Amino acid sequence: MLSEQGLLSDCGNNYFQMTSCILSGSIQTTPQVSAGGSEAKPLIFTFVPTVRRLPTHTQLADTSKFLVKIPEESSDKSPETVNRSKSNDYLTLNAGSQQERDQAKLTCPSEVSGTILQEREFEANKLQGMQQSDLFKAEYVLIVDSEGEDEAASRKVEQGPPGGIGTAAVRPKSLAISSSLVSDVVRPKTQGTDLKTSSHPEMLHGMAPQQKHGQLTSSPTTSEQLACKPPAFSFVSPTNPNTPPDPVNLEGASVLEEFHTRRLDVGGAVVEESATYFQTTAHSTPFSASKGTSSTLLFPHSTQLSGSNLPSSTAADPKPGLTSEVLKKTTLTSHVLSHGESPRTSSSPPSSSASLKSNSASYIPVRIVTHSLSPSPKPFTSSFHGSSSTICSQMSSSGNLSKSGVKSPVPSRLALLTAILKSNPSHQRPFSPASCPTFSLNSPASSTLTLDQKEKQTPPTPKKSLSSCSLRAGSPDQGELQVSELTQQSFHLPVFTKSTPLSQAPSLSPTKQASSSLASMNVERTPSPTLKSNTMLSLLQTSTSSSVGLPPVPPSSSLSSLKSKQDGDLRGPENPRNIHTYPSTLASSALSSLSPPINQRATFSSSEKCFHPSPALSSLINRSKRASSQLSGQELNPSALPSLPVSSADFASLPNLRSSSLPHANLPTLVPQLSPSALHPHCGSGTLPSRLGKSESTTPNHRSPVSTPSLPISLTRTEELISPCALSMSTGPENKKSKQYKTKSSYKAFAAIPTNTLLLEQKALDEPAKTESVSKDNTLEPPVELYFPAQLRQQTEELCATIDKVLQDSLSMHSSDSPSRSPKTLLGSDTVKTPTTLPRAAGRETKYANLSSPSSTVSESQLTKPGVIRPVPVKSRILLKKEEEVYEPNPFSKYLEDNSDLFSEQDVTVPPKPVSLHPLYQTKLYPPAKSLLHPQTLSHADCLAPGPFSHLSFSLSDEQENSHTLLSHNACNKLSHPMVAIPEHEALDSKEQ
């Protein structure tokens, strides 16, 4: 499991790595989190998102086993595997057996990716069995090279299952290792590792740079190292042996910004992990060159720290062990919240891993945005705030987020949020991210993470959750805590993971665009179990992803940064900035989260504040909103409002997010959470930009509100709390959107049923009372990413409905005209009645249907929506005119009343009139006038041949004949065609035609 998770971690983020670890732990500790309810056991994840500089090596080690156990078994694997995976980056041979053993997946980023995936799944099961500790770092590290960021993200998304595998494929070593790392971290002794991670975060940061040096290979290793061994080892382990900086690493760049700083401190690569920082770090540290070196260095460090753990593993192996050890140490020492810290560290390592990967593959930005990939329809507890974040990050990274972006996903999506919006549009979808929405860059990481999670977690989309969590943990302490918790929660609520991706993911179905896509993929890969739990979370996550996605987790940040660069357009500079900030927050969050719910709350507040600022976040928030809409079941909206007040800094969306989140947790509990959520929103937006400062300031506020709900919520709830923060962000937009939907609801009423359904869902979101149930439904509903597409669809439908309305109105006017004409017409009251009833009842289409040809009616109706109605009506009108001509003579007769004789003698009188009116149709008129039957036929032909007066001539002939059939036809025609009546009308017709 650990290795599995480690892999995810690696892929996702060093930060996430830690989270992943926690997540893994959650999986193992089914008891802790029942929300996810993995197949065997509900993954119980106590996510302690640790935001720290991404360690070059993120090592996931079971707290107990660390790296010591090389066996594929979850515990053993995680530390050793993580290290090894990272090592494997540069030293695939390790991957051979050790990799499989440790991380089977991590070791061979590319080759082993599949293996890792399998192992991961296997491990996930094992892990569940192991259930080392509640705490698992569910850190999602998405490592993408600055240039290949999106690409990597995409790959990751595709390969998301393996977690690192996707990236591994792209940057096999880096991604795989990253994944491993993350997995390991997650899996590691989630608790021990987490603790270490806490301390480790800074170290991790240091490691991250090293990792970057190690590039793909190094990255995972570093990540692993960081995650596992977090403390100094991480830093030293990382690519930069020169930065042995346990201190530096520990210090890391305080989070991304901080993280960045931490990362930079550690090895530049660390910073790069944030995206920008990662890049910088990567650049700073010879990432590509040191790819192998990085791994090696990391390993050496790892060896130092955990040499005992896996000396044979090679430097890499030992390194992981060391990393685990260090991580523990660091976590404990570095962060008081060792719990939160360790997740954070875990996260960090993944981030680092991501960084490394980024470097090697140009993965510089390992930005893990929690995309709420809400890929899984299953209700996830919003609590997977972090997941959401991750998804978002993914989306953001991929640009899916840019939706957000699932789809994002939300995202998502919503390409992350169509795929990722659906997953994506991730997704995600899109996330879409979302992102994930949505969110592709992150998406891959998220994907990877999710994969790890998934496999470990069995439940679908645990990764996403992880990612989200990681992202969530944007605040150094709080952020991390959140991420961790979220991650754990994600794992706990596999559904949540599924939910995402946006965002993120993201979510997956729709989830944030890119993110969602990735997230969705992840979710899909993840077993349904996770989906159930995570779906709701996912939705929330997606929201979070959107809102938090940007910066959510340090890793997320890294990715975000990277993505920022790539998706800078999308997210804008803020995203990178956010990302930078976020890592710190994440670390804090992780620490807080791990430590206690209260910490988490504090983290939330920090994150929230941090989250608040980023415009990119705003984007995400919008996505989140959508995600929330999906979550709409959640009664967060009202809560969100309260939340909003709490986090005045946070966007209104934050409150919304919060509200989304709340529903996830329990409404009662969630409400308290809401406040925290409001605070937490910083995770999404503010987190990245001013994650640290804000997170600190927010922490106090957040803590008090969150603490109460958090505790009630339980581990899962705690995560949920975090999630709510992310959700609150996304909810805000959602609320806005909900309002919009409500505004549009009138139109929607006329829209197709699907639109109505969406409306109902949105309403549910708006109504907190309904939110809870709806949130469950939302789980089933498409992620945010889907929502985006859904929104588009709804808008289109609404537009069509409006058009139809207008057309109907015009038709009704025509109908009234027809009736008017009917009376005017000499035809009997029967005829008049018929036209009136038919047109009114059926409307234009019905009129046409009443006409001899239903096909024309159908075509007309079809055309009506497009606005092609006129062309069709022209044909219909022609037919109508023919038939109407029969009774039209009456209107003409009025005009021709002067010549009643002429009227009788249609041939003589009518021709002149028609001639005057329509010279072209004179000839046509003549034949109809001459013989009723023939004229009728002719009139039909005439009708076929467009002629406004065709019907006139026909009407004259009909009138002469007084054929009941013709009259009936005329009545029908009249009904269908308003133009039948008067010369004026005819003029109109001619104009129309």
Curated annotation (Swiss-Prot):
Region (Disordered): 71-90, 152-171, 186-225, 231-250, 300-322, 334-358, 443-481, 500-582, 677-711, 811-864
GO molecular function, one term: lamin binding
Keyword Isomerase: no
GO CC terms, sorted: cytosol; nuclear envelope; nuclear lumen; nucleus; PML body; sarcolemma
Tissue specificity field: Predominantly expressed in the heart and skeletal muscle. Also detected in liver.
Biased composition regions of type Polar residues, renumbered to the chain: 80-90, 212-225, 300-315, 500-532, 695-711, 849-864
Record-given protein name: Muscular LMNA-interacting protein
Gene, per the UniProt record: MLIP
